[in-house]
Amino acid sequence: MALISRPRAPLWLGRLSRRLCGRHQACMGTMARPRRFTVELPDCSLTHFVLGDATDHRDARLAELLGPPGRSYALCVPLAPGEGCGPRVQAARVHHRLLQQLRRGPLQRCQLSKLLGYGPGDQAGEAQHGFLLRDPCDHPDTRRDLLQLLGSCQEAARPQLAEFQADSQGLLWQRLWELQGDRQVQVDCACVLPAQEPHLHPLLPDLLNSAVFQDRDAARAVLEECTSFIPEARAVLDLVDQCPKEVQKGKFQVIAIEGLDATGKTTLTQSVSESLKAVLLQSPPPCISQWRKIFDDEPTIIRRAFYSLGNYLVASEIAKESTNFPVIVDRYWHSTATYAIATEVSGGLQYLPPAHHPVYQWPGDLLKPDLVLLLTVNSEERVRRLQGRGQEKTKEEAELEANNVFRQKVEMTYQRMENPSCHLVDASPSRETVLQKVLELIQSSGR
């Protein structure tokens, strides 16, 4: 079943590809719109390419990325037809499962990169998450293994396998393959051409209500889709449904304190609450924190819905406690949104949503704090503190330590939050100095 691989295809293959593409486009007519793709490179830059008709244009960067030596493959997870968030949840689960399968077994021989497919417009629902796989040794069984993996998908919207190949004239082609019985069948082809970088990251239209939720109902709808395969989702929903939809803050101050790893946030929140005789709350709250590990292992849309609903549970507690005492909140909506944006938007700092984008705006139905403080430390102090830490870390905390670009994206995203914005506090000095500074900020904001 395996086919013989060659570094470059013969001349007749390029001619055949052109004829196949012409027939396909004639049959599809105006329905066949070019698909665009973006790939994150090791230096955190993004490269874009589009599928279209053959031209004489050759792009050295694309040839190096997708052409020989070795062989490259791509797959994107499509959305199934349907209304609501069900298709997005299903696609996210397929993508998550494929990632786990690609990281084990014989397909570990392939190098993985993030791939995003998107349409020519900027409408939500066009983005398709996927993978670019690079087989440096061009193993003869890689295509077969990938087709069998995709063939095991039971979902209606099944991913297709694309393979990249250069012809004798140096043009790059993408060919779609299917496994029909025990035969590998090519079902489509198109020429791979460079594309201009869009003005905004192509994922931005899909960020809202897929990673950053604008209201309680949007997050709730996602977990509702999960109750059949995550029993704990029903328990979370039951707790949320016990909370009134509209809550109001009491007469006392509500202060949210945010901070990256090694900023001393946990210690500071305790000290501030003791100094002010305030109630200390955490997000997610203890009533659902027992299920964090379960949801941390789920795809982004499910994980973020869980943390978003945790904020609404905390809001109910804030409303109750702030009638009698000041309230200090250890993390709130800003951290939920910040990590979602920094994780989902591929590439470096320049690809983040621009300032004043809707993803930086506080949800209209979530109780708002009076003041949000963001603790920061300089790099030297951060390294010193991290060396003394041994507690278990979340995936995102581990990423913060290992990936400086991700850390910069998190910091920049925090600083772009609005309504309310974050007040930066340098937490590098001694604990006593930082505590005094924070208490002064709280006092001045309450005047």
Swiss-Prot record:
SUPFAM superfamilies: P-loop containing nucleoside triphosphate hydrolases. The keyword Mitochondrion applies. It catalyses: CMP + ATP = CDP + ADP; dCMP + ATP = dCDP + ADP; a 2'-deoxyribonucleoside 5'-diphosphate + ATP = a 2'-deoxyribonucleoside 5'-triphosphate + ADP; a ribonucleoside 5'-diphosphate + ATP = a ribonucleoside 5'-triphosphate + ADP. The keyword Nucleotide-binding applies. Residues 1-73 form a transit peptide. One of its GO terms (cellular component) is nucleoplasm. Its main location: mitochondrion. Induction: By lipopolysaccharides in macrophages and in primary microglia. InterPro entries: P-loop_NTPase, Thymidylate_kin-like_dom, UMP-CMP_kinase_2. Residues 380-412 form a coiled coil. Disruption phenotype: Deletion mutant mice display calcification deposits in the brain. Neurons show reduced mitochondrial DNA copy number and impaired phosphorus and energy homeostasis, suggesting that dysregulation of mitochondrial function may promote the initiation and progressive development of brain calcification. It is found in: Mitochondrion. Keywords: ATP-binding, Coiled coil, Kinase, Mitochondrion, Nucleotide-binding, Pyrimidine biosynthesis, Transferase, Transit peptide. Gene3D superfamilies: P-loop containing nucleotide triphosphate hydrolases. Mitochondrial nucleotide monophosphate kinase needed for salvage dNTP synthesis that mediates immunomodulatory and antiviral activities through IFN-dependent and IFN-independent pathways. Restricts the replication of multiple viruses including flaviviruses or coronaviruses. Together with viperin/RSAD2 and ddhCTP, suppresses the replication of several coronaviruses through inhibition of the viral RNA-dependent RNA polymerase activities. Concerning flaviviruses, restricts RNA translation when localized to the mitochondria independently of its kinase activity. This is UMP-CMP kinase 2, mitochondrial. It comes from Mus musculus. The lineage of its organism: Eukaryota, Metazoa, Chordata, Craniata, Vertebrata. The gene is Cmpk2.
